[in-house]
Amino acid sequence: MLTQFMNALAGPGPSPDILLPAGGSLPSVFAVSDLAQASVAAAGAALARLVGLEGASAPAVLVDRDLASAWFGFSLRPQGWTLPSPWDAVAGDYATADGWIKLHTNAPHHRDAALSVLGVDGDRDAVAAAVSGWEATALETAVVTVGGAAAALRSVGEWDGHPQGRAVAAEPLLQVGSTSTAPSAGTAGPDDRPLAGVRVLDLTRVLAGPVATRLLAGWGADVLRIDPPWWDEPAVVPEVTLGKRCARVDLATPGGRDRFLDLLGSADVLVHGYRADALEGLGLGPDIRDDARPGLVDVSLDAYGWTGPWSTRRGFDSLVQMSSGIAHAGMVTTGGDRPVSLPVQALDHATGYLLAAAALTGLARRRAEGTGSRWRTSLARIARLLVDVGSAGGLVGDGIDPEAPRPADPVEHTVWGGVRRIPPPVTVAGAPLHWSLPAGPLGTSVAAW
């Protein structure tokens, strides 16, 4: 998988030595730990290439397989407090009249949408009873139509034959294009903080995008995350806001749009994870963004790909696993009687590290060629990669526990309490990952550089 990532990135700069020592594997019918190690290595290699542009050889990259697998779960270990559950009480898998469906109801408006279709309140037993009378694809369509998030269980073969599955399979792993000439190619930071001075504007939520920007912050980037006034994700904020400042701006208002464009005008990188048509609907399409910041490195993801009938569909890692055949293959291969998902949100995390690699490669291209670039991928395309590598034909892995690695000694002091983090999964020689800011709540910083 690393070869596929590196071929998709194809950045300038000298190639580094990449060391991938053996380790354990997360228990799965798919090569989840291979995906973890390869995606983290792609990001490390992209940084090494960027550093190598300054005239020295590219520094060596080492990725600890067990730590990469663990960072695909949670990196933090709360000291004397607990994280809330990431799942709403209604969220999960339900048997339908002809199969299975997953309802994703963590966001209040998604929960309201699903319950409005089913005509029940939030009692899980009532939801299960109502779902049992529906065909899976009919309920999926009904929930999505009213603005909810749901996915019927499909096999790999069914997804291969679905119009959206075919569209995703035809897309490259990374879609990339050059944009306008940058007024300045940028300069390198100090050897140990190679992204110092790089400004990253973060319009992402939950996991994939925040994983990308967290990594960039760890190498010294100034990351400013922007959320709307009403958004929160308390179960993951302590995990993904490490190293970032977080502000609130309502992009749907004229003042908020102007504020965003002002911030964008001084940014080096924009990472966004809204649905494919969302920024365009706010009057912030790609041409507007490029005009606001010539030479911008514009990096984005969506759930179901950028072409096909579902290109603007709401989606999350767990839903894409249902749609793409991953959860079905897990069920069939293990002899289970219900969908079997991956042991971690692997699509989110792998996509996040690939986005970080794309951002770093975009910075390298701007430094080498003087132009901006636009990069896109999707959770569904990463799922396609994982499926193409193949199922092991049974549950593989030695039972590595993503909670097992011993956390580092330094305590990160947060508003929630003390936190210890497990050691970083990647080492780029001379540029250790470390974060200058602790994780913090959303909306606690001013929307300014």
Provide a role label for each language-model segment.
Residues 217-252:
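PLP-dependent aminotransferase-like
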Residues 308-344:
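Rossmann-fold dinucleotide-binding core
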Residues 245-291:
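A structured beta-alpha segment of the ubiquitous adenosine-cofactor-binding alpha/beta core
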Residues 205, 251, 275-276, 302-303, ...:
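Short glycine-/small-residue-rich Rossmann-like dinucleotide-binding loops
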Residues 1-230, 261-266, 288-305, 327-334, ...:
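Acyl-CoA thioester-binding alpha/beta core of soluble enzymes
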Residues 285-291, 303, 313-321:
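Glycine-rich beta-alpha-beta "Rossmann" dinucleotide-binding loop(s) and their flanking helix/strand
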Residues 247, 258, 318-322, 353, ...:
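Feature representing long, continuous alpha-helical segments
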